[in-house]
Amino acid sequence: VPILVNSYFQSTSQVLSVQVTLFCAGFGTLFFHLCTKFKVPAFLGSSFAFLGGFSSVAALDTGIFANMADKEKLQYACGGIVVAGLLYLILALIIRCVGVKRVMRFLPPVVTGPIIICIGLSLAPSAVSNASTNWLIAIVALAVIIIFNIWGKGMFKIIPILLGVVISYVFALVLQGLGFTNPDGSVILNFSGVSSAAVVGLPPFILPKFNLTAILIMAPIAIATMMEHIGDISAISATVGQNFIEDPGLHRTLIGDGIATSISAMIGGPANTTYGENTGVLELSRVHDPKVVRLAACYAIVLSFIPKVAEIIASMPASIIGGVSFILYGMISAIGVRNVVENHVDFTKSRNLIIAGVILVSGLGFSDGLTFTIGSTSITLTSLAIAAIAGIVLNAILPGNDLSLIHISEPTR
């Protein structure tokens, strides 16, 4: 996310810091686990859903934003994210007051399943775009993951993603050492920032600033991310075989995610999310112990105080990220399909076909979102927000809704 966000700004230096992002991911994950009684094996990472918001804030050039430095624009974007995180608390309060069953009446598998599918498929262009920077390296990363996941033994079978990243990174180093470049002529690995970075140093934290325009750009994205959160928790539940929507409760997961997001933005980090990719990792590794996730969070915090590590991460070729994403994003969508199948959604019923169809088309069709104007301010809803709203509304108004709570069954091994 920092690599993508920084590409929206004109500055040649990091605007959104990798160090701060690592710290916020680690701290946010630990806080989330505290809120959820240490039961949910979720790692909070940077939300892709807010990329459009960052891009819009970066493009602002009127009023107070005219001739504004990139760092200051980031501060206003963070201010909007602080407000977005607080919206989670409102939904959590509603769930706490009326009960998760009444809320989940409006989010049966026919709604959450297609939303999970959209989460994965909506990220597919990002995977292809990143992989296309160097298809050879991307294919190596993809192949290594597949080989170790299918034919690996012992520990190697548990960590195919890490092996895919490390081996493809070494492969990229070898290619660069032999004089190869990316197809567009650019260097495969850029180590200019690594050599100048200190070994130990504090993350460059910054404080948010608040402006209504930036808030109205960033905060509505929470509509999508809250639905993504529910879909992610449903997917994690399906993967692990435990109903985390009931225990520790959806209100707790929302509180943990929302406050972690606001805290992250308060120190200059991106929005946190329960991370759909996390579900793919759980499925591939088959390691579901929350203690392992908390250990990973501690590693992230430690690494955030080592600038050289942050620069090495920043130097990772987009092609490696793309190759890994082919597996992870596909896993997310596949889990959405499994969620529908295991909950026996009856697609002989027209209402279910209509709901699922509208969600899928909305989630994939509105690639640029939907923009509307209130006064002089334009607000854009992302495709996932539109899909979620459409699915919830259709499920509520179409006849034949059994208003049943989502059922999480034991995952297929």
Predicted segments, located by residue:
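Hydrophobic core segments of alpha-helical transmembrane domains in multi-pass membrane transport
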Residues: C24-H33, S55-S56, A84-L93, G113-S126, ...
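Membrane-embedded helical hairpins/re-entrant loop segments and their flanking transmembrane helices
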Residues: N6-H33, A219-P290
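Core transmembrane alpha-helical segments of multi-pass membrane transporters/permeases
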Residues: V1-L4, A77-G79, F210-G231
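Early transmembrane hairpin of solute transport permeases
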Residues: V1-A138, S285, K308, S315, ...
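Hydrophobic alpha-helical bundle architecture
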Residues: Q10-T12, H33-V40, S262-M266, E277-L364, ...
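Membrane-interface helix termini and inter-helical loops of multi-pass transporters
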Residues: A66-N67, S129, F180-S186, S192, ...
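Long hydrophobic alpha-helical segments that form multi-pass transmembrane helix bundles
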Residues: S132-T225
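Residue-level detector of conserved catalytic or cofactor/ligand-binding positions
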Residues: L403-T412
